């Protein structure tokens, strides 16, 4: 989604966060096809800019052993608890729901992650440049 949700917000209806709480994120995050490598060396899910599954330098190990979700709590919430879990996690870091609402689950996720990046360094929320150049 990236900047599109910020630039096109006035053209589409928005909804409260709870509308997207049960929208599944596991399939796009964990699928074995349509992934990307960014120019910073991150292995990324195909549709999820700003999320790193790990480094391309450790790709063989990553593909053999998988992602250590204990070291990547944001991914853990997205995989096992969808948006509701990530929203609750972000609230623990002071997140407040956006009054104007969200265009989609991806818009909500990006807003949650942007808030989390401002509060703490999360290995999976990379590259930092993704978040600093959103608006």
Place the predicted regions along the sequence by residue.
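Accessory C-terminal segments flanking Radical SAM cores
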Residues: 2-125
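Short microdomains enriched in Cys/His and/or Lys/Arg
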Residues: 122-135
């Amino acid at each position: 989604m990236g900047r599109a949700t910020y630039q096109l917000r006035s053209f589409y209806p928005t909804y409260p966060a709870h509308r997207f709480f049960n929208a599944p994120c596991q399939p796009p995050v964990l699928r074995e096809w349509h992934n990307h490598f960014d120019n910073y060396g991150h292995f990324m899910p195909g549709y999820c800019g700003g999320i790193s599954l790990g480094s391309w330098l450790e790709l063989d190990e990553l593909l053999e052993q998988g992602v250590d979700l204990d070291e990547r709590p944001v991914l853990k919430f997205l995989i096992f608890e969808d948006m509701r879990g990530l929203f609750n996690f972000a609230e623990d870091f002071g997140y407040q729901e956006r009054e104007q609402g969200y265009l989609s689950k991806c818009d909500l996720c990006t807003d949650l992650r942007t808030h989390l990046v401002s509060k703490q360094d999360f290995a999976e929320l990379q590259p930092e440049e993704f978040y600093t150049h959103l608006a």
